[in-house]
């Protein structure tokens, strides 16, 4: 799906008063389970898991490929990766159609506050079409999550936070919260919270479980 196609692909939640844009996940069953058929843009999404390398990156590859595709008619924007726990394996990303020249790796100095500050700045800068960030459960409280949700809405940015599964116990203003786990040869996606939708469970197959991190080096 081309940039103009998915950018115009909108939905209205049951309680929504404005149209919301989405970007298709690239996986039919998951698109069917999400309002409008994709990841919500201009919103905060939380991806919860017990660990890394269980399909979290493979699940994002189609969307990342679409977001990083060059379009001469549009200004260049970045997809920022903040504090990834691994060094992404460039050949795997390219194999999935991701333009690695549009990826920006950011490694803040140690400390949860520095990391959260970097995330918010990346979203508010207006130069990022997407922000992927890895944070600990204890580092992000309701206040900062609301700030990120608001910043995402203002900038129309696709913001994803990767958090440990125990963050599920915390309240969150995120438009979408999902929990990932392994299910035989698939990645199980449990939709915990979905604005304009309802909880669901979808098994997604068809990509390597450890995706672009399969040959990554730990940091």
Predicted regions, residues:
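Phosphate-binding/switch region of NTP-binding enzymes
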Residues: 159-219
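Helical mechanochemical/support elements of P-loop NTPase systems and associated helical scaffolds
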Residues: 26, 56, 89, 115, ...
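P-loop NTPase motor core
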Residues: 108-178
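Conserved RecA-like P-loop NTPase ATPase core
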Residues: 30, 47, 103, 131, ...
């Amino acid at each position: 799906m081309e940039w103009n196609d998915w950018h115009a692909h909108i939905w209205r939640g049951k309680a929504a008063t404005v149209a919301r844009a989405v970007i298709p996940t690239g996986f039919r069953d998951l698109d069917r389970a999400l309002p409008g058929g994709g990841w919500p843009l201009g919103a905060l999404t939380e991806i919860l898991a017990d660990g890394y390398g269980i399909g979290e990156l493979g699940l994002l590859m189609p969307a990342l490929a679409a977001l990083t595709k060059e379009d001469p008619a549009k200004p260049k924007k970045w997809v920022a990766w903040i504090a990834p726990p691994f060094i992404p394996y460039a050949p795997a990303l390219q194999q999935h159609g991701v333009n690695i020249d549009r990826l920006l790796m950011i490694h803040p100095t140690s400390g949860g506050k520095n990391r959260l500050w970097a995330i918010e700045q990346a979203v508010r800068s207006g130069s990022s079409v997407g922000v992927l960030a890895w944070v600990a459960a204890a580092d992000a409280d309701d206040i900062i999550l609301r700030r990120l949700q608001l910043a995402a809405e203002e900038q129309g940015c696709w913001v994803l936070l990767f958090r440990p599964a125990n963050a599920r116990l915390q309240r969150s203003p995120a438009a979408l919260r999902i929990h990932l786990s392994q299910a035989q040869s698939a990645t199980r996606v449990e939709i915990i919270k979905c604005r304009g939708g309802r909880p669901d469970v979808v098994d997604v197959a068809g990509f390597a479980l450890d995706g672009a991190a399969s040959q990554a080096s730990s940091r």
